[in-house]
A protein has these predicted regions:
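Helical "lid/coupling" subdomains associated with nucleotide-phosphate turnover
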Residues: 1-141
Length: 141
């Protein structure tokens, strides 16, 4: 381990790849936000993990995330591999399908079934976020 120009520790994985305290903190914050979000969504719907048919991971996050590693640090619940689905850029794919098919009534039907849930101002989210900062596997409910 060495120190950077600010005196912060730098852990070298190779001569060109290294990990800093800022990297670990960014991981902790992302992990806490995702885990808290999943917990709040489940609680909001009154669901347990066993009731889920699947967990869909989208965008660059979903494409490159290793679900086993994410579960090991508590970012995601431990689920059977068959219940974890990486769907790529779902928003772009959906928009492209809509543009090609021109079926606005189907899109309206989906929109009418959606519920927007703002997490940032919720006290239960703040509590779950703080609880999920440590990098450890969680006992998901």
């Amino acid at each position: 381990m060495t120190r950077d120009e600010n005196g912060c520790g730098v852990f070298h994985l190779t001569d060109r790849v290294y990990l800093t305290a800022a990297d670990v903190r960014a991981l902790q914050l992302a992990k806490a936000a995702v885990a808290a979000g999943v917990q709040i969504l489940l609680a909001q719907q009154g669901l347990s993990l066993s009731a889920l048919d699947g967990l869909y991971l989208s965008g660059g996050f979903g494409m490159y995330l290793d679900p086993a590693s994410a579960a090991a640090i508590g970012m995601l619940p431990r689920l059977p591999a068959a219940k974890l689905h990486s769907v790529g850029n779902a928003a772009l794919s959906g928009a492209a399908q809509l543009a090609l098919r021109g079926n606005m009534s189907a899109a309206d039907g989906i929109v009418n079934r959606l519920t927007y849930l703002e997490l940032s101002g919720r006290p239960d989210f703040a509590d779950a976020f703080a609880e999920n900062i440590p990098l450890r596997s969680m006992q998901w409910r």
